[in-house]
Amino acid sequence: GRLREIAFRSAGGGTGKACDIDSFDLMDPPCRQLIVWDPENRIILGGYRFIIGEDVKICDDGRPRIATSHMFGFSERFKREFLPATLELGRSFVRVGYQSSKAEAKTIYALDNLWDGLGALTVVFPQIKYLFGKVTMYPGFPREARNMILYFLTKYFPDPDELVRPFTPLETGMDTAALDALFTGGSFKEDYKILNRCVRDLGCNIPPLVNAYMGLSPSMRMFGTAINDEFGDVEESGIFFAISEIFEEKKRRHIGTFNPRELGFMA
């Protein structure tokens, strides 16, 4: 919890408390913690918290008892058909000192190992068919770059069934006509080149986690964006995808390399 708070606060988010431990870490059953451990230096490099769908309880008001339920509304179809087989992810962080532009190689290493851990979870919990998480952008991130990224995500990863929607969608002031005219590549690959170039021209980069999710599955859904007023007013976009539809290269890299028997997960 302390490492999480330090990492998020350094980027402009966080709870404002000394330690980021909340009711979702302490409830019964609680969220579990996935960490990247550096055995040589004996430090935690990063982590996620997660909860499997079968452990999610539905509150009296119909909301699932998960961290995103104060920002997003979940359709009855989502709760019935998808949630029981979903792994909800949150609080993804990389340790301060491993997340700056100067530490780019270390950052990529930590993120890559986090993805290895997520891949392992899909093996340890074979009943899980979907991953649901969030990507975060901070108040200090340039608005123009933010709008380009959100436009791109909405264009290529829509949620036509409205499975999940933010209660109060982020007001972006987005110039949709200008962005329509900007993204004329005609394909994900070409429009991504435009996005990457334009964001860099504004003096920043596409956040690493956003990049990672965009490269996982062609059928990912983006559920819209809301302000998390309980976490430093960061802007969080819900994302969701089926494990079966992850690109084969990513499956081989992050799922196929995990041997549960070596670690004693299976008899």
Protein language model annotation of sequence segments:
Residues 7-15, 160, 220-223, 246:
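Short secondary-structure junctions and interdomain/linker hinges
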Residues 55-220, 224-228:
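Acyl-donor binding region in acyl/amide transferases
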Residues 1-52:
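Short amphipathic alpha-helix that is part of the acyltransferase structural core
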Residues 24-35, 58-59, 220-221, 231-237, ...:
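A short helix-loop-beta-strand connector motif used in the catalytic cores of GNAT acetyltransferases and
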Residues 36-38, 50-52, 91, 133, ...:
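Hydrophobic side chains in beta-strands
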Residues 237-267:
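C-terminal non-catalytic accessory extensions
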Residues 6, 40-42, 53-56, 95, ...:
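Short loop/turn segments at secondary-structure transitions that flank enzyme active sites
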Residues 31, 45-47, 84-89, 128, ...:
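Extracellular structured ligand-interaction cores
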